[in-house]
């Protein structure tokens, strides 16, 4: 498979990743003739950093996947199932700026009468640049199903050292939360943005 990468994905000091959503049952991944990695476990997605293997903007890149129908985990994985093989879920690219959110964990506690929810967001950030990212902060906003902002907060992250990761605990409260149940499947959308407090430059 050949593909090109959009200019917007090739940001300064950013990263480009490829994710394979599901491949049964094991495979080697190659980009432009270079082995990227090996993976097993058919039903879990796997993500690989391919930034340094990509050609210049506009040039075609070649993706190859060498799939094995059986591996040392097949016996456990395919009990009482039809043995199959191949790519059966989406394959897609994602990109991140130099400073970005790597992972997060969100938990909440409701008060006794369910009229408020105290939210705890554990935010993991990474700086892939060669210089420190100083004066960083995070803006967190929560939206209901109609797109209305129901809660927001800002948190100071400070300096994220070059090539290092950071972690921050952020708290916010949602009043009169619309709870989820089978008859009323209410959902919220959370948006997290990282920005430089001095320049206002947004990274994500």
Regions found by a protein language model. Name each.
Residues 45-53, 165-175:
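Exposed aromatic-hydrophobic patches
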Residues 1-103, 128, 145:
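Accessory beta-strand-rich segments of carbohydrate-active enzymes
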Residues 72-82, 150-152, 198-204:
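Beta-sandwich strand segments
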Residues 31, 115-159, 166-170:
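Beta-strand-rich binding/interaction modules
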Residues 104-105, 191-204:
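N-terminal carbohydrate-binding accessory modules
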Residues 9-14, 54-60, 131-133, 174-189:
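Short glycine/proline/serine/threonine-rich loop/turn segments at secondary-structure transition edges
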Residues 64-66, 189-193:
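Extracellular recognition modules
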Residues 105-112:
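Short beta-strand segments of immunoglobulin-like
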């Amino acid at each position: 498979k050949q593909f090109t990468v959009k200019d917007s994905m090739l940001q300064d000091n950013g990263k480009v990743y490829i994710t394979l959503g599901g491949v049964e049952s094991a495979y080697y991944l190659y980009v432009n003739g270079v082995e990227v990695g090996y993976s097993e476990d058919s039903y879990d997605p796997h993500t690989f950093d391919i930034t340094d293997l990509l050609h210049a903007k506009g040039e075609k890149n070649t993706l190859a996947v060498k799939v094995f129908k059986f591996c040392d985990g097949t016996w456990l994985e395919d009990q009482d199932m039809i043995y199959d093989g191949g790519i059966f879920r989406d394959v897609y690219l994602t990109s991140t700026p130099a400073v970005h959110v790597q992972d997060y964990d969100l938990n909440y506690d409701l008060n006794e009468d369910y009229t408020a929810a105290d939210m705890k967001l554990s935010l993991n950030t990474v700086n892939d640049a060669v210089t420190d990212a100083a004066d960083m902060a995070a803006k967190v906003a929560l939206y209901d199903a109609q797109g209305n902002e129901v809660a927001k907060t800002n948190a100071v992250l400070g300096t994220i050292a070059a090539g290092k990761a950071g972690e921050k605990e952020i708290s916010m409260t949602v009043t009169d939360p619309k709870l989820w149940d089978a008859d009323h499947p209410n959902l919220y959308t959370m948006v997290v943005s990282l920005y430089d407090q001095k320049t206002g430059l947004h990274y994500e």
